[in-house]
Amino acid sequence: MAFEAMFQPIQIGKLTIRNRVLSTAHAEVYATDGGMTTERYVKYYEEKAKGGIGLAICGGSSVVAIDSPQQWWSSVNLSTDRIIPHFQNLADAMHKHGAKIMIQITHMGRRSRWDGYHWPTLMSPSGIREPVHRATCKTIEVEEIWRVIGNYAQAARRAKEGGLDGVELSAVHQHMIDQFWSPRVNKRTDEWGGSFEGRMKFGLEVLKAVRAEVGEDFCVGMRICGDEFHPDGLSHEDMKQIAKYYSDTGMLDFIGVVGSGCDTHNTLANVIPNMTFPPEPFLHLAAGIKEVVDVPVLHAQNIKDPNQATRILEGGYVDMVGMTRAHIADPHLIAKIKMGQVDQIKQCVGANYCIDRQYQGLDVLCIQNAATSREYMGVPHIIEKSAGPKRKVVVVGGGPAGMEAARVAAERGHDVTLFEKKEQLGGQITTAAKAPQRDQIAGITRWYQLELARLGIDLRLGTAADPETILDLRPDVVVLANGGHPFLEQNEHWGAAEGLVVSSWDVLDGTVEPGKNVLVYDTICEFSGMSVADFLADKGAQVEIVTDDIKPGVAIGGTTFPTYYRSMYPKEVIMTGDLMLEKVYREGDKLVAVLENEYTGAREERVVDQVVVENGVRPDESLYYALKQGSRNKGQIDVEALFAIQPQPCLSQSGEGYLLFRIGDCVAQRNTHAAIYDALRLRKDF
């Protein structure tokens, strides 16, 4: 069988796992405020089990004590026996499909917040504040150390009594255990610090207490980093020594390795590598750990496709491959490999929409798979054929909304024609992929191209659809997903009508040549403005990106904005906040941009060759209004049915003519996920 290495069973402790692929611990943000797993939580993991995964380690940063708050990211609370029946539901759901399920347990120490819920006093070995979470903390006392050690043991007991297959102790991401390990955080001079053995003592006592509570038959592992990548942090050689120390105790069944610490904004970007990173960028660190330990080594980080996973396993670098974001993108990945449907796998593109939402306090979603984590609502991963009449469906627009609408309609068995005025599919994805940091996002379009071809959809590329062209096809349903245009006309003094400003699309698509001295004005503060600034600097331009917000890129998530900074600072891009673009005028062969400080009203001028404005998208609505009055439903979507994931009532109502719906940016600008979600939840019942 192809990819045979992925399908070899593995023994971890007393546990046999059916294959070498796992979903590693991550913060899902699906538990309740009280930390109990929900139907959403269970269904999210069960879908991976249905799809054939061998092992899932759930509950990234699940807490063992109430003074390590879990509410901020809705993780699991193992500090109470109330969690046990919830675990039983989760374990049953996974086991009935042949998968194993463990949970990560931890005390976060200083890596949290104190300003809410129980308002706890946070603790760390020496009371040193963490840069990312910014929370102050106290120096943990010896009595508290022993209490927390007991908390770990009781949490492990609850996992075992709940029917889970094991626990993973988090000693990564600067949680309490590895806070004790690190000399830059642990400045203690008592038995819990100082020497190597002193710094290891807390983790050792936790491991001993857990093992004493759960016995030898229950799987216990530890997740560590391979190198903190901090000037005075733990090096790879230090981590090899630590891994060997704990492995040699004989109390660990496995070690999971992550390639970086993450208690600074810069190192946080390493932990969940986005599309700017190469494949498996930290595999060498996991392989280095494997050389010195006698237990299986697990590793995730940018392992996205079966060829890559097979190469890693066949090379003996690690014993199990974590394909965590790969399973967020497609929980049926393993099943599709077995069925010879590799080209149908929806491959993760490293957009990090999932984890960046978590760092913004939101639930984890996938940029391209709108069904992920919505299984409990009835949003399907597998589209079933309709039992109703076959319909003629016309879709206008080949961006993400249009491609998803066409795909789902074809999967339902309908006759689908898609019009796209450009010569290629992709819409704004194609434009975004031209920026230095965003090229891999084109993988979304690649998957749709393969799917639309497989489904036999009538693609009419390079064809602008007008009402006559559409109606000549005698459609039953018309879906408009024809997008919008850059909104440069909001302020007439910007001079868009006179050609004084251009859009980010103009620059990235090559419609205009990059200037040599460029001002980018960005009101959106997401990827588009930062991408065009990075693109221009890459072309050798002198660039200043200005925003009326507090800083450029402020709406970009925590694992992504650092990679922009890494790219743009060396190119000497100037990043300026709190300035509004008032007007642009020509002076000789130069442009003068007049900026006003939001708070002081003081005005500044920039003399440049080019002004690029990123001000979002204005819907293209003319086609909609041309078709609206002739449609049976007057273009209206029943939002109650849409939000409840129910069929549109008009689908079951008889009548002459066509139904009309519009989705994506031709309604209002949102994002790629929103466009795909609207298409899926609208079309799944056609």
Predicted regions and their residues:
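Flavin-dependent oxidoreductase catalytic cores
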Residues: M1-V396, P400, E404-E411, D415-V416, ...
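Short beta-alpha connecting loops at secondary-structure transitions
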Residues: L268-M275, D319, I429-Q437, F661-A668
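Short, hydrophobic/aromatic-rich segments at coil-to-beta transitions
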Residues: G588-A593
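Rossmann-like dinucleotide/flavin-binding elements
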Residues: A387-L418, L461-D472, A481-G558, V594, ...
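Rossmann-like dinucleotide-binding cores of NAD(P)H-dependent redox enzymes
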Residues: D415-L455, E526-L581
